[in-house]
């Protein structure tokens, strides 16, 4: 660590004690319930002795919250916040304070999970619906998704969509030579393993003889040039190819939309709509398509449906496209997106409205025009007469001295050799423009030059069509109205600030307030990802510590922080394996073994790197079938690339033979990818790198406390053994190289760098001892829940000593035969008790997977278990004939205020039974705003952007 700090001596006031839910007295009572004499005995019964790490985890002593924040201040002081005029897809922006305080800093928003349970996610879903509406309106296209990871990833996903959907059946893709450089490198990474050829050139001439399935044009391009893309789009369409525009959202308030110009797909970043640059992220990217492509659109889509009363209700639509259902046939491996950032961007548009956005855009453009006029006066004519917010000039031999003078003014310019780029944004003042002129050698007055500036948007590219016409973008002009709107939406959702979220494989633990504080400090939030490294010294000191700690925790030798999600970490890890085999002359190794219980991202990721998936069966105990593994490893020995295995397994058990599994794969020349989704059961107790794994990703939004944000952001760094280290994802911004053994998987070299502060503080606060204790209590909590529920809902899988890991699968499938109850009924009934449901039907259809984490107290675990037991009693009443399943409170759940307020009540159970089930609170009850959502209706009547209000007024009444 960069600064030595003394450890905190008083364990009674330590952060670990507040992070971990059960008190010492609770732990003793829970151990008695699970029939273990001590936590140590329980760990010995849970983990195979062959994988236990020998030495205690050592990442330094735990710090107090005050000490940790002081340490972060010292790191922040090492970062230098210059004015960024670099551009290249990242812009300074102003997050309205009402949005910062009431969304970004509000646990009601940032601790929620992905809205798979729509009834308790209506506020978040409405915000995402606003985002989709905003994107559709600005791009002029029909359907948008609810965010992607970053612009580079969005471009790669659009390329893949074009390959699936175009009439042209070639394997070549055209890329405008003036796309953002980081986008081009991500495209190269995605294209190479799939055998797609990139043709990089000038759309004006190089498209003529090219046979391609699609083409990507930047609008405006990375130099700032604003060119009419219609001729290039027409050429692409003539070839049977799809046209993709990477478009700047703020520019689209003034210039013609991609839809008007004939584009099939639009992608880009919503970062400049109120989201800080954060040294690379997190930011919400977007993708919009014409209607014919909607079923091939990657990522999540929010649609409008109806609830059980016929009232409007939002839900995730067209989920059969996604990896958790389609696996290797999915449109993408996307799981985590950028929901929290998409919500911020949408609310930025709600806050400003169309008039406000246009005013911001006009101001930015006007100042850029003034800048250009001054540069001309100084002898530096912009390369293009048409632009929005960026100009590029040829500086020749003066380039280095201009850059140095700009840095003396605390300004960063973009540069490519002797060509200098100056990009303005909503934070740019007249003083900054004058400072930029000084860097170019001139003392000019903004007021004097302003009269010479001219509009630089050509008449044929001026926007004509209206946008953001829905009332939601007009009704919240005052901060009072905006504040109340945000509060209203937050109140509709159930997040960790209200109750435990026991989702298996999701690790919904505490996101402590202290961990979130540095996120908004300008020293972390305001850095452009491509500033000189010396200006980000504090960041790099933090990166070094994080990489060291993750290596100590995992047993690996090197770590890349670049992947922006767990799925992207999988992708990067498999690319490393692929690169390793190719470097050894074994590029023919393309078979990936995947257990049938694997998360859907695993086969989807394998497919994305050109591997062929071979499924390995599981035995009756939920473990990998060793006989089947041996047979398939032998059958594919010459072509075996890897196995992807989750540990502990997705069945919630530490498999006894994990070392044998690794040995079998290694014996046949393969590598072991160990999915780190369940690392929360291993930290301090076992290290994947010690028992045979070669590579893993670490879900920082699970094990290491980055909040889920309602569906993102997330981070998925990967750790590798030394032989794979040369094949970690590279990035030209870190070493200046344009070619790497494995190219970048994210647009920014360190992914969503700013949220790494959260995991970093968590580790500072816990220390090695605290992290280990958290793992032990996570396992104890899970075994406690299993012990309490087993007599009512049998636990499906245990190890040979009767233990589970950090999560368990309960099995109500027999109850469906005896009562007709479904897992959906149980999930919706839990809402009446104030709980989010456990994970449904994964990895075993018809079951529920529960993960309580270490952060939940015994009291909360008991409240959840009591609710589940009460639901079992309600099922028994159906079995005994008190009422049919259709007439039961289970099938009518969740119950809403509309139900309790009905003038008439004709149901077979009492009103109080439905609305206030046994053990639930009447004084602080959570009321979900809608009844059970009709999923079938939503997919058959797809609506993915705000309709005219009058269309739904009657239903709402």
Curated annotation (Swiss-Prot):
<comment type="similarity">
    <text>Belongs to the GcvP family.</text>
</comment>
<dbReference type="InterPro" id="IPR015424">
    <property type="entry name" value="PyrdxlP-dep_Trfase"/>
</dbReference>
<dbReference type="InterPro" id="IPR020581">
    <property type="entry name" value="GDC_P"/>
</dbReference>
<dbReference type="InterPro" id="IPR049316">
    <property type="entry name" value="GDC-P_C"/>
</dbReference>
<dbReference type="GO" id="GO:0019464">
    <property type="term" value="P:glycine decarboxylation via glycine cleavage system"/>
</dbReference>
<comment type="function">
    <text>The glycine cleavage system catalyzes the degradation of glycine. The P protein binds the alpha-amino group of glycine through its pyridoxal phosphate cofactor; CO(2) is released and the remaining methylamine moiety is then transferred to the lipoamide cofactor of the H protein.</text>
</comment>
<dbReference type="Pfam" id="PF21478">
    <property type="entry name" value="GcvP2_C"/>
</dbReference>
<dbReference type="InterPro" id="IPR049315">
    <property type="entry name" value="GDC-P_N"/>
</dbReference>
<dbReference type="GO" id="GO:0004375">
    <property type="term" value="F:glycine dehydrogenase (decarboxylating) activity"/>
</dbReference>
<dbReference type="InterPro" id="IPR003437">
    <property type="entry name" value="GcvP"/>
</dbReference>
<keyword id="KW-0560">Oxidoreductase</keyword>
<dbReference type="InterPro" id="IPR015422">
    <property type="entry name" value="PyrdxlP-dep_Trfase_small"/>
</dbReference>
<dbReference type="Pfam" id="PF02347">
    <property type="entry name" value="GDC-P"/>
</dbReference>
<dbReference type="GO" id="GO:0005960">
    <property type="term" value="C:glycine cleavage complex"/>
</dbReference>
<dbReference type="GO" id="GO:0016594">
    <property type="term" value="F:glycine binding"/>
</dbReference>
<protein>
    <recommendedName>
        <fullName>Glycine dehydrogenase (decarboxylating)</fullName>
        <ecNumber>1.4.4.2</ecNumber>
    </recommendedName>
</protein>
<feature type="modified residue" description="N6-(pyridoxal phosphate)lysine">
    <location>
        <position position="702"/>
    </location>
</feature>
<dbReference type="GO" id="GO:0005829">
    <property type="term" value="C:cytosol"/>
</dbReference>
<dbReference type="InterPro" id="IPR015421">
    <property type="entry name" value="PyrdxlP-dep_Trfase_major"/>
</dbReference>
<keyword id="KW-0663">Pyridoxal phosphate</keyword>
<dbReference type="GO" id="GO:0030170">
    <property type="term" value="F:pyridoxal phosphate binding"/>
</dbReference>
<comment type="subunit">
    <text>The glycine cleavage system is composed of four proteins: P, T, L and H.</text>
</comment>
């Amino acid at each position: 660590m960069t600064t030595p700090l003394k450890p905190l001596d008083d364990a009674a006031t330590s952060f670990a004690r507040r992070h971990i839910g059960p008190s010492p007295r609770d732990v003793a009572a829970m151990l008695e319930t699970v029939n273990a004499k001590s936590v140590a005995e329980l760990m010995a019964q849970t983990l195979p002795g062959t994988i236990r790490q020998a030495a205690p985890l050592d990442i330094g002593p735990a710090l107090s919250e005050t000490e940790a924040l002081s340490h972060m201040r010292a790191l922040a002081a090492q970062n230098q916040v210059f004015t960024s005029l670099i551009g290249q897809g990242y812009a300074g922006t102003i997050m309205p304070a009402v949005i910062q305080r009431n969304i970004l800093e509000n646990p009601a928003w940032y601790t929620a999970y992905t809205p798979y349970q729509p009834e308790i996610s209506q506020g978040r879903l409405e915000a995402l619906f606003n985002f989709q509406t905003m994107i559709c309106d600005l791009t002029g296209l029909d359907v948008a998704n609810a965010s992607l990871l970053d612009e580079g990833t969005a471009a790669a996903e659009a390329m893949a969509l074009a390959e699936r959907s175009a009439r042209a059946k070639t394997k070549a893709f055209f890329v405008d030579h003036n796309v953002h450089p980081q986008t081009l490198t991500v495209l190269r990474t995605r294209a190479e393993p799939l055998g797609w050829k990139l043709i990089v050139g000038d759309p004006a001439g190089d498209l003529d003889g090219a046979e391609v399935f699609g083409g990507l044009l930047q609008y405006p391009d990375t130099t700032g040039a604003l060119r009419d893309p219609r001729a290039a789009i027409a050429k692409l369409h003539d070839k049977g190819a799809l046209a993709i525009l990477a478009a700047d959202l703020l520019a689209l308030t003034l210039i013609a939309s991609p839809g008007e110009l004939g584009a099939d797909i639009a992608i880009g970043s919503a970062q400049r709509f109120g989201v800080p640059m954060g040294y690379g992220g997190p930011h919400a990217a977007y993708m919009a398509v014409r209607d014919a492509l909607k079923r091939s659109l990657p990522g999540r889509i929010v649609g409008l449906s109806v609830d059980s009363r016929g009232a409007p209700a939002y839900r995730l639509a067209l989920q059969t496209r996604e990896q958790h259902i389609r696996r290797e046939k999915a449109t993408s491996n996307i799981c985590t997106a950028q929901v929290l950032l998409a919500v911020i961007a949408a609310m930025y548009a709600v806050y400003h409205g169309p008039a406000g956005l246009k005013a911001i855009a006009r101001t930015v453009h006007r100042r850029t025009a003034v800048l250009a006029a001054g540069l001309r006066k100084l002898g530096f004519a912009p390369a293009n007469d048409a632009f929005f917010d960026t100009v590029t000039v040829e500086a020749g031999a003066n380039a280095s001295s201009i850059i140095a003078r700009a840095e003396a003014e605390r300004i960063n310019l973009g540069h490519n050799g002797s060509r200098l780029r100056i990009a303005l944004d909503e934070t740019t003042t007249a003083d900054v423009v004058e400072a930029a002129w000084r860097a170019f050698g001139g003392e000019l007055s903004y007021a004097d030059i302003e009269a010479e500036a001219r509009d630089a948007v050509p008449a044929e590219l001026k926007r004509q069509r209206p946008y953001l016409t829905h009332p939601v973008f007009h009704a919240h002009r005052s901060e009072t109205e905006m504040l109340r709107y945000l509060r209203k939406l937050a109140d509709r959702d159930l997040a960790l600030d209200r109750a435990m979220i026991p989702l298996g494989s999701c690790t919904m633990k505490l996101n402590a307030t202290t961990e979130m504080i540095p996120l908004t400090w300008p020293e972390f939030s305001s850095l452009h990802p491509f500033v000189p490294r010396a200006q980000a010294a504090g960041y790099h000191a933090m990166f070094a510590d994080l990489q060291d700690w993750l290596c100590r925790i995992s047993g690996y030798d090197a770590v890349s922080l670049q992947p922006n999600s767990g799925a992207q970490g999988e992708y990067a890890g498999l690319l490393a394996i692929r690169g390793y085999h190719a470097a050894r002359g074994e590029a023919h190794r393309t078979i990936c073994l995947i257990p049938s219980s694997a998360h859907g991202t695993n086969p989807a990721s394998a497919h994305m790197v050109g591997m062929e998936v071979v499924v390995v069966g599981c035995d009756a105990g939920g473990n990998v079938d060793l006989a089947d593994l041996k047979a398939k490893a032998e059958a594919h020995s010459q072509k075996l690339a890897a196995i992807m295995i989750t540990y502990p397994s997705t069945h919630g058990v530490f498999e006894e033979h994990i070392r044998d599994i690794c040995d079998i794969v290694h014996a046949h020349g393969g590598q072991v990818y160990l999915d780190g989704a369940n690392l929360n059961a291993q930290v301090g107790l076992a290290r994947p790198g010690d028992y045979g794994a070669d590579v893993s990703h670490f879900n920082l939004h699970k094990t290491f406390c980055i909040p889920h944000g309602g569906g993102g952001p997330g981070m998925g760094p990967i750790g590798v053994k030394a032989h794979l280290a040369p094949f970690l994802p590279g990035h030209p911004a870190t070493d200046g190289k344009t070619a790497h053994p494995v190219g970048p998987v994210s647009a920014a070299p360190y992914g969503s760098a700013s949220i790494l502060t959260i995991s970093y503080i968590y580790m500072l606060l816990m220390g090695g001892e605290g992290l280990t204790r958290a793992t032990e209590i996570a396992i104890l909590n899970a075994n406690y829940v299993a012990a309490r529920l087993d007599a009512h809902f049998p636990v499906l899988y245990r190890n040979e000593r009767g233990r589970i890991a950090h999560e368990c699968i309960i099995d109500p499938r027999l109850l469906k035969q005896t009562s007709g109850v479904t897992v959906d009924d149980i999930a919706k009934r839990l809402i009446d008790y104030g709980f989010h449901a456990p994970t449904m039907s994964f990895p075993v259809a018809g079951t529920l997977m529960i993960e309580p984490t270490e952060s939940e107290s015994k009291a909360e675990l008991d409240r959840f278990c009591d609710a589940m037991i009460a639901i079992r009693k309600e099922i028994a009443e159906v079995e005994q004939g008190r009422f049919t399943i259709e007439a039961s409170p289970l099938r009518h759940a969740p119950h809403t205020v509309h139900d309790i307020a009905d003038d008439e009540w004709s149901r077979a159970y009492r009103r109080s039974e439905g609305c206030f089930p046994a053990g639930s609170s009447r004084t602080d009850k959570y009321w979900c705003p809608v009844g059970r959502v009709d999923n079938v209706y939503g997919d058959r009547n797809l609506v993915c952007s705000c309709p005219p209000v009058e269309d739904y007024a009657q239903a709402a009444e």
